[in-house]
Amino acid sequence: MQHESPTSGMNMSALRRHKQRLDLADESVAIEVPGLNLFYGDKQALFDIALNIPKQKVTSFIGPSGCGKSTLLRCFNRMNDLVDGCRVEGAINLYGHNIYTKGEEVAELRRRVGMVFQKPNPFPKTIYENVVYGLRIQGINKKRVLDEAVEWALKAAALWDEVKDRLHESALGLSGGQQQRLVIARTIAVEPEVLLLDEPCSALDPISTLKVEELIYELKSKYTIVIVTHNMQQAARVSDYTAFMYMGKLVEFGDTDTLFTNPAKKQTEDYITGRYG
């Protein structure tokens, strides 16, 4: 009797997706996307996305403008729910739980999956109050607890030594790079499991960019990090895994060094060598 392999009934497209996802089978997976489609009204923006994002690693999304990188990133904490007419088909499993389950507590999801945007967005409050903002929302007001959270979050964000004597001054007086690290401190103060970074260095100068990249490297020992970047050199420097997207589709996903030095797809090679995009 001839025995069929587990993949024998798949078409070639499904087989490629299956193999991409199984490449990370030996890793501890934080986010599993088994097959995701997203629509804005009648227009489809993401097409059958399937990938596994490993725990406590840095995964970068690269691709030309409008390819769906940020759209996919915003699915991981359901920020796209805020867009009128947006519809998601499929599942995203965060540590095995589908975050698109009916009745999901989205506020709690966004605590577990924090997000930092490309333009630093500190609140018009003191540095201290920026860091403890999320904790206060959770009803935590004991001064000792807040003080400890401020110190460890700012230290984790490599900002403590620069602001420890200015905690009660306005956060708006910080430089752009300091503001972005403050936003990261504010995000991790509520102890998320995943950090989503949407082009976090695009508005920063090279020195500030280097500090944020060093911070990303330090933070991955505790957090799963997913970063969207237009800067391929940055993706190569900071990430363990890279996904290349084009026109709403996942073209290639794998180990960063391999993807940049020996891509499996010609489309990927053309993009990273500057032939288009």
Curated annotation (Swiss-Prot):
Keyword Zinc: no
Gene3D superfamilies: P-loop containing nucleotide triphosphate hydrolases
GO molecular function: ATP binding; ATP hydrolysis activity; ATPase-coupled phosphate ion transmembrane transporter activity
Record keywords: ATP-binding, Cell inner membrane, Cell membrane, Membrane, Nucleotide-binding, Phosphate transport, Translocase, Transport
GO aspect biological process, one term: phosphate ion transmembrane transport
Residues given in the record as ATP binding sites: 63-70
Cellular localisation: Cell inner membrane
Membrane topology listed for this record: Peripheral membrane protein
CDD domains: ABC_PstB_phosphate_transporter
Residues annotated as domain ABC transporter: 31-272
PROSITE patterns tied to this protein: ABC_TRANSPORTER_1, ABC_TRANSPORTER_2, PSTB
A GO cellular-component term linked to this record: plasma membrane
Main location: membrane
Protein role: Part of the ABC transporter complex PstSACB involved in phosphate import. Responsible for energy coupling to the transport system.
Subunit structure and binding partners: The complex is composed of two ATP-binding proteins (PstB), two transmembrane proteins (PstC and PstA) and a solute-binding protein (PstS).
Protein name in UniProt: Phosphate import ATP-binding protein PstB 2
Organism: Pseudomonas syringae pv. syringae (strain B728a)
